[in-house]
């Protein structure tokens, strides 16, 4: 059949069979894609794609055992569509195939129309795992976030009131020192590899004065964390260590015969001169996240409680007392690094842990019946947890990290709003991400290259949102400066976008309300409610309500959509293909009577339709009345045109 080639612009369709992309363009009969939303008040929907493939030779028949793709024609295969114009290649769509339906028109013709959805569908199916759980009430001596997305980690004491020295170091000993002063937790280290613990980096918290001004660890303590690994190479791997002469402890992983189990070791030098080892016979290298909780209590000359829990259950086998001890003579803590004890130690953890270690919390007590069982309850799903103080973009990064979303398909702004911590495990990731979008009043969509894209409020006043990326003209405008010609345009002027009473609610019932009596006297009272806004401060609720009221208290002539024939003018094809959701464009209409009408708009959605002889593009658009007011900006510095930002 003919190639999808339009006046110098060519389309390419690739499917990922196995680990490589395969070009199937020669079999494509038609393609249609849809991304974005109809208007700025809608939620960005899951992008979709339909591709019809010639199947007369049964290349795309899952039951054709002689076919080259047999065994790989399965749901959720990656598919991507690109277009090349001139020397530039542009992304159109990337997603995941849902089905391979077989169609037989007659003995001489057969085709497959595959449907695909973008990453929103995958994230909608991804449920937040239980290792989001962390304590909300009890006192924490140390808390290491071990953020997956950047390799950073946080450390702070229970009250955020002490100046505790904290240090990140490389395995070569180089490092930087920061302090945990009063205020929010600090990023005290930055390493692109520490989150994977691949031997290039490890983290170390140094506190030579001890924790809370007493002995390096209490005579009673416990440590909690989540680990995830697929390590099968035999050896002893360091996970966590706090060494001292009196109350030291360590946790490691022993891999033997490809099977990995955990070992907890406890020292009490100066008293019984012994080490107590707990060996939990639960395989932990299955690639799943595992909750670990290790306890220690001394009275001080005898051991009373040393237990190791995995996934909420105490399954340890106590292997007895030994003459070797925890040798480090000063207080420090290492995570994911080798742990050297003594020449006679039963387990010297000589290797770097390879995998993921998350949410390391050191407690100043052992949780049992008299204190509650909080850390063990963290393993149970559904009870929720709190991270107080994350910015919206950072929270999104955690959400994506906990379901192992690829870094190269992630494009997140930092965020401007600080959010509440309430997240319930068991909800899907997409819903949790959209909560952050609402809190920020930003934009969350899947870009044309398949990335999860988050634009915060600050970015809405920069870049493509501010600088016009293209101009559209009707076909009656033919001067040398004309823009992309459009074939159809939809104007609206109705009551759908009139709201003069805005109510914004936090979880728990706190709310802010903004009203405009003048608008209500003209158009009646029209209420819009935004629920479950996860901001941590009431003034942000007020700002959201005021901003939304300014945008929608009065009607406005809108351009909801415009349609372009991509083949009408080959020289404009690159400009069409370059446009993306969130881009600023101008549209000019030449009426039969009067002067030109010019509107500045934001692209909200993009649809492409390709056949062997046609290419039609539809853009959904919204007004720019939600652009912020920016001082000293010739474009965004005009009152009564822009919204005062917050």
Question: Which residues does each predicted region cover?
Answer:
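Beta-strand-rich assembly/attachment modules of structural machines
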Residues: 1-129, 163, 169-182, 244-245, ...
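Envelope-exposed proteins and targeting segments
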Residues: 47-49, 93, 110-112, 450, ...
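Acidic, small/polar-enriched beta strand-loop surface segments
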Residues: 1-29, 133-210, 220-223, 233-235, ...
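Intrinsic-disorder/low-complexity, polar/charged segments enriched in Ser/Thr/Lys/Arg/Asp/Glu/Gln
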Residues: 48-50, 113, 141, 220-224, ...
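Secretory/extracellular carbohydrate-interaction modules
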Residues: 216-219, 223, 227-239, 244-246
């Amino acid at each position: 059949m003919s190639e999808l080639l339009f006046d110098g612009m060519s389309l390419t369709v690739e499917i990922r069979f196995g680990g490589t992309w395969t070009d199937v363009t020669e079999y494509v009969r038609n393609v249609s894609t849809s991304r974005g939303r109809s208007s700025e008040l809608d939620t960005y929907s899951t992008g979709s794609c339909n591709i019809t493939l010639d199947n007369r030779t049964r290349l795309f028949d899952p039951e054709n055992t002689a076919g080259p793709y047999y065994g790989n024609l399965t749901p959720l295969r990656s598919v991507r569509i690109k277009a090349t114009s001139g020397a530039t290649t542009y992304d159109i769509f990337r997603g995941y195939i849902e089905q391979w339906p077989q169609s037989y028109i007659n003995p001489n013709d057969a085709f497959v129309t595959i449907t695909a959805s973008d990453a929103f569908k995958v994230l909608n199916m991804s449920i937040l795992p239980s290792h989001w759980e962390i304590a909300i009430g009890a006192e924490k001596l140390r808390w290491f976030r071990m953020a997956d997305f950047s390799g950073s980690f946080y450390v702070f004491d229970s009250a955020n009131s002490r100046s505790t020295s904290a240090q990140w170091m490389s395995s070569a000993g180089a490092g930087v020192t920061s302090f945990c002063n009063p205020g929010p937790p600090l990023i005290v280290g930055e390493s692109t590899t520490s989150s994977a613990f691949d031997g290039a980096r490890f983290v170390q918290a140094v506190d030579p004065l001890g924790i809370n001004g007493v002995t390096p660890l209490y005579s009673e303590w416990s440590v909690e964390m989540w680990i995830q690994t697929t390590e099968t190479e035999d050896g002893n791997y360091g996970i966590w260590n706090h060494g001292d002469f009196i109350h030291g402890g360590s946790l490691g992983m022993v891999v033997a015969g490809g099977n990995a189990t955990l070992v907890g070791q406890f020292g009490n030098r100066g008293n019984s001169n012994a080490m107590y080892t707990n060996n939990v016979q639960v395989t932990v290298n299955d690639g799943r996240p595992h909750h670990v909780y290790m306890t220690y209590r001394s009275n001080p000359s005898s051991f009373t409680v040393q237990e190791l829990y995995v996934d909420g259950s105490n399954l340890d086998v106590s292997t007895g007392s030994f003459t070797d001890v925890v040798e480090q003579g000063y207080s420090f803590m290492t995570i994911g690094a080798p742990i050297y004890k003594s020449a006679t130690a039963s387990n010297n953890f000589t290797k770097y842990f390879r995998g993921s270690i998350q949410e390391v919390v050191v407690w100043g007590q052992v949780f049992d019946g008299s204190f509650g069982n909080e850390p063990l309850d963290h393993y149970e799903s559904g009870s929720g947890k709190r991270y107080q103080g994350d910015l919206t973009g950072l929270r999104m990064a955690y959400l994506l990290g906990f379901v192992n979303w690829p870094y190269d398909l992630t494009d997140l702004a930092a965020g401007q709003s600080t959010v509440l911590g309430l997240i319930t495990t068991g909800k899907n990731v997409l819903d949790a991400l959209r909560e952050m979008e609402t809190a920020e009043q930003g934009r969350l969509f899947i870009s044309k290259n398949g990335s999860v894209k988050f634009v915060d409020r600050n970015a809405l006043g920069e870049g493509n949102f501010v600088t016009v990326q293209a101009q559209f003209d009707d076909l009656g405008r033919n001067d040398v400066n004309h823009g992309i010609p459009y074939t159809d345009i939809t104007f609206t002027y109705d009551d759908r976008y009139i709201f003069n009473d805005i109510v914004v609610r936090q979880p728990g019932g706190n709310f802010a309300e903004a009203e405009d009596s003048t608008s209500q006297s003209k158009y009646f009272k029209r209420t819009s409610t935004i629920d479950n806004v996860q901001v941590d401060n009431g003034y942000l609720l007020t700002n959201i309500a005021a901003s939304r009221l300014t945008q929608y208290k009065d009607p406005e002539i809108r351009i909801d959509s415009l349609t372009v024939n991509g083949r009408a003018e080959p020289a404009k094809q690159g400009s069409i293909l370059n446009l993306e959701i969130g881009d600023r464009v101008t549209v000019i209409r030449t009426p039969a009577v009067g002067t030109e009408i010019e509107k500045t708009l934001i692209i909200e959605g993009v649809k492409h339709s390709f056949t062997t002889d046609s290419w039609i593009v539809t853009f959904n658009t919204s007004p720019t009345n939600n652009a912020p007011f920016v001082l000293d900006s010739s474009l965004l510095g005009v009152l009564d045109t822009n919204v005062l930002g917050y």
